[in-house]
Amino acid sequence: MAHENVWFSHPRNYGKGSRQCRVCASHSGLIRKYGLNICRQCFREKANDIGFHKYR
């Protein structure tokens, strides 16, 4: 069994490795609330387009 066959052969059905940002495919800093599945960096860029507004 070569290294190419072993790489990423472990099933990722749960945990951080199973979820990714729908914009940039990153696994870190994911916001899952309300089914967003967007990382926090992309959320700051797209928040106004999605409909989130900042109130003071």
UniProtKB/Swiss-Prot annotation:
Record InterPro entries: Ribosomal_uS14 (IPR001209), Ribosomal_uS14_CS (IPR018271), RIbosomal_uS14_euk_arc (IPR039744), Ribosomal_uS14_sf (IPR043140)
GO molecular function, one term: zinc ion binding
Residues the entry annotates as binding Zn(2+): C21, C24, C39, C42
Keywords: Metal-binding, Ribonucleoprotein, Ribosomal protein, Zinc
GO biological processes: cytoplasmic translation
Cofactor binding summary note: Binds 1 zinc ion per subunit.
GO CC list: cytosolic small ribosomal subunit
Similarity comment: family membership: Belongs to the universal ribosomal protein uS14 family.
Organism listed in the record: Eremothecium gossypii (strain ATCC 10895 / CBS 109.51 / FGSC 9923 / NRRL Y-1056)
Zinc recorded as keyword: yes
Protein's name in the database: Small ribosomal subunit protein uS14
Cofactor needs: Zn(2+)
